[in-house]
Amino acid sequence: MTIETTDNVAKLSSGIHFVSGIDTDAGKTVCTGWLARELLCRGRRVATMKLVQTGCGDYSPDIRLHRRLMGVTLPEDEEGITAPELFTYPASPHLAAKIDGRPIDLAHLIDCANKLAESYDVVLVEGAGGLAVPLTENLLTVDFACAQNWPFVFVTSGKLGSINHAVLSLEALQRRGAELSAVI
């Protein structure tokens, strides 16, 4: 496995990209907002989306942080398109959905991402947790994103153990034939 050193932002100039990381609190939300701001500064029209947000009420705190970092608001935030699935219990998406008593609507998630892609040059879709987090009882987040052919932005950290987690995650993406846009 080799790691390229390139201008990551340039690889993200168009399309839908899925932002994942080594685990919860790896820095995905900050990286998503920062990348969006960098792309905005380069003249791209950018939207961010939180695929599933758990442990929240009627809004996504991650989307709010994206907007603060980007220095913009988006009308799609008010329409619920940028945070289509919100769950109250702080857990993996599949467990939070079960506790809240409603399933995750995968078709709706895809529709929201595609609707954003119609209006913006770049859509950064932030996942919850790491690649192997169950989105539903039968579907891992990584497999959902791969099925959409979304390239990945992978976020790691400097904390102890992160090299191991990063290598295992990157190998999982490689085994699935996933495109990697950036490693941060």
Question: Which ranges hold each PLM region?
Answer:
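Short, glycine/acidic-enriched loop or turn micro-motifs at the edges of active sites
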Residues: 24-26, 53, 129
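Extreme N-terminal, non-catalytic leader segments
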Residues: 1-21, 25
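N-terminal phosphate/diphosphate-binding loop that engages ATP/GTP or pyrophosphate donors
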Residues: 12, 16, 30-103, 107, ...
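Residue-level preference for the first positions of well-ordered beta-strands
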Residues: 14-18, 46-47, 122-124, 151
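Short secondary-structure boundary/capping elements
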Residues: 27, 31, 105-108, 136-137, ...
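Glycine-rich phosphate-binding loop signature in dinucleotide/nucleotide-binding domains
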Residues: 115-121
